[in-house]
Curated annotation (Swiss-Prot):
The gene is hisB. This is Imidazoleglycerol-phosphate dehydratase. It catalyses: D-erythro-1-(imidazol-4-yl)glycerol 3-phosphate = 3-(imidazol-4-yl)-2-oxopropyl phosphate + H2O. The keyword Metal-binding does not apply. It comes from the Bacteria. Keywords: Amino-acid biosynthesis, Cytoplasm, Histidine biosynthesis, Lyase.
Length: 194
């Protein structure tokens, strides 16, 4: 089983995440930010990952620390659970519509952290979630997980729909990239390491 459990504590947050890449063994999300919980649930459900998130943060200050630090720990969990990445597909992509919105996510589990994020999020706040932090979350996941991530909203009107489509697309693209392919011998890189 490819799993990881990581706890990260700072003066601002304490985040514990358990991730199971191979079995959707249950999804339990508790960040104190309702919309963010909904997005992480959609990410795990459509990525078919087992995911438990317990995030305690300084929400009285701002949700930014909790959201970004959750991204850091989630990325670290992917990195740890993947190990040496032998036999994985490595690349994954997904287009996900949500009503009038269409999002795309493309990943390369290359060992190199990079983010290209292109989404016009016109509504600045959804419940307790500052929408500008969406990009910070995606960057935190990609950089801590050490992978390339290109995430974009091709079009849409409703900010909730745009962000939800992005989270679902990220889940589906990572599902494709972490999949074991019996035809892949060893590490999927000409360098021999990722």
């Amino acid at each position: 089983m490819r799993t990881a459990t990581i706890t990260r504590t700072t003066k601002e947050t304490t985040i514990t995440i358990s991730l199971n890449l191979d079995q959707q063994s249950g999804i339990q999300i508790a960040t104190g930010i309702g919309f963010f919980d909904h997005m992480l649930d959609a990410f795990a459900k459509h990525g078919r990952f087992g995911l438990t998130v317990d995030a305690q943060g300084d929400l009285d200050v701002d949700p930014h620390h909790t959201i970004e630090d959750t991204g850091i720990v989630l990325g670290e969990c992917f990195k740890q659970a993947l190990g040496d990445k032998a036999g994985i597909e490595r690349f994954g992509s997904a287009f996900v519509p949500m009503d009038e919105s269409l999002a795309r996510a493309v990943v390369d589990l290359s060992g190199r952290a990079y983010l290209v994020f292109d989404a016009e999020l016109t509504n600045q706040r959804l419940g307790g979630f500052d929408t500008e932090v969406t990009e910070d979350f995606f960057q935190a996941v990609a950089f801590a997980g050490e992978f390339n991530l290109h995430a974009s909203v091709l079009y849409g009107r409703n900010t909730h729909h745009k962000i939800e489509a992005l989270f679902k697309a990220l889940g589906r693209s990572l599902r494709a990239a972490v999949a074991i392919n019996p035809e892949v011998q060893g590490i999927p890189s000409t360098k021999g390491v990722i």
